[in-house]
Amino acid sequence: MNASPQRRDAFYALQTESAKLAPIQDVKTRWNSTFLMLRRAKRLRPYFTPFCDEYERSDLALDDDEWRQIEYLLWITQPFFEFTLELSKTKDATTHHVFKIYNKLFEHLEQSITQLRRKRVPWKTNMLQALEAAQQKLKDYYAETDDIRGDLYAIGTMLAPTNKLRFFQTDEWEEQWAQRYRRSFQDYLIPYKARLGSTQTSLPYQSSKRSGSRLDMMLGSQQPDNLSRDKLS
């Protein structure tokens, strides 16, 4: 279609009651391009079959089972899309959100993997392998936060008034991590304490009146689902 203006116009002509849209191609180097491609495909679903019929390419038309796979892939990738979108829009510091975002994504993948392990349909079995690979890749990226000198991600997390040290004192964290991050935080404050002690200057307290961002809302509660939770029944 992209190589043929005539075919593109023919595809547009099928869209009589909506804006004229073309499919989006996945681009490996572009963030969220897979999600955007699938979302556009779902929107254009009514036009693909008649377009394929017109050019006698029924072999390229997706069946109901393949559309079901697209629905599920959209559900899987939506949280990644939402977090990427919000992080790219914000102009504020986001270091204190890193662990929360990872936790949300791990939880999402784990729930999906647990559901898929009960399935025996071939495409769901293949999807399980893909999700397990995605989970491992996310673990690899998460492990890199430990390599940052001085545990800066943890310190940034504790500096957020809504987190403090108690963020690392929940059942999700082993006690050793809270102890380690507490020591790192204390070490981080040493030069500032010395500087403050030499000046003896008190800074006026200023309360923040800012309302929470959408990113705060996403991390503070269960992320809203625009797609059905159960895509595997």
Question: For the regions a protein language model found, what residue spans apply to each?
Answer:
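Surface-exposed, charged/polar loop-rich segments
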Residues: 1-32, 36, 42-49, 132
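Hydrophobic positions within alpha-helical membrane elements
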Residues: 37-38, 165
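Extended, C-terminal/distal alpha-helical "rod" segments
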Residues: 48-233
